[in-house]
From Swiss-Prot:
One of its GO terms (cellular component) is respiratory chain complex IV. This is Cytochrome c oxidase subunit 3. Residues 35-40, 106-128, 184-190, 257-261 are mitochondrial intermembrane. The chain crosses the membrane at residues 16-34, 41-66, 73-105, 129-152, 156-183, 191-223, 233-256. The keyword Mitochondrion applies. It is found in: Mitochondrion inner membrane.
């Protein structure tokens, strides 16, 4: 083993960036094949290779940080900056959807009937399932904060309980959203209202699924005693991401469900 005179992690050569790029190519090509030729072979291949790449890449990161000690305070600081920049990029991603929604709704064209919601669209009642979804996500924000405080205080059992509650609430939100989509009186093809509604809420739903998966990984890592009160960036990143998902939903609820209806 060579002697290291600095606090930074010099990453070993890894095949995962290459396999990740190839899986992304397969997924995008597969989507085109699915849309135009109703063939899902390439898409399934891309999704499978992408899942395998993510599993093996993050397995390596966990090994390097938890078992090999490569994630020094300086490395963790860099990872925190990286996560902050990633969340900022996600904010800009959702800004595009809100821009499309407000561009269409604040000055509805004659084709839409000069009103919003457009003529013929029956919007969902914001005081029914959407309000329940809001309370579910707000409760999950409280429970993830409870988990974080429990971890900082060294209370492992409370941390696991709070994390489990957060995951359960995330899964419940996803099921409620799926039932709402199934019962919705309009579709993604119903003009600009349908497309902005389903694209914005659908991408948020995808982020909830990603965040829930992130938290499930943290739950199993905590079962194996991977986190301590001063070394838990994996969980911290998951908590930041979950709070971001909460805040985006509040904007979606106020804009699309309440004001937009």
């Amino acid at each position: 083993m060579t002697r290291q005179t600095h606090a930074y992690h010099m990453v070993n050569p890894s095949p995962w960036p290459l396999t990740g790029a190839l899986s992304a190519l397969l997924m995008t090509s597969g989507l085109i094949m699915w849309f135009h030729f109703n063939s899902t072979i390439l898409l399934m291949l891309g999704l499978t290779t992408n899942m395998l790449t993510m599993y093996q890449w993050w397995r390596d990161v966990i090994r390097e940080s938890t078992f090999q000690g490569h994630h020094t305070p300086n490395v963790q600081k860099g990872l925190r900056y990286g996560m902050i920049l990633f969340i900022i990029s996600e904010v800009l991603f959702f800004t595009g959807f809100f821009w499309a929604f407000y561009h269409s709704s604040l000055a509805p064209t004659p084709e839409l009937g000069g009103c919003w919601p457009p003529t013929g669209i029956h919007p969902l009642n914001p005081l029914e399932v959407p309000l329940l979804n809001t309370s579910v996500l707000l409760a999950s924000g409280v429970s993830i904060t409870w988990a974080h405080h429990s971890l900082m205080e060294g209370n492992r059992n409370h941390m696991l309980q709070a994390l489990f509650i957060t995951i359960a609430l995330g899964v419940y939100f996803t099921l409620l959203q799926a039932s709402e989509y199934y019962e919705a009186p309009f579709t993604i093809s119903d003009g600009v209202y349908g497309s902005t509604f389903f694209v914005a809420t659908g991408f948020h739903g995808l982020h909830v699924i990603i965040g829930s998966t992130f938290l499930i990984v943290c739950f199993f890592r905590q079962l194996k005693f991977h986190f301590t009160s001063n070394h838990h960036f994996g969980f911290e990143a998951a908590a930041w991401y979950w709070h971001f998902v909460d805040v985006v939903w509040l904007f979606l609820y106020v804009s699309i469900y309440w004001w937009g209806s």
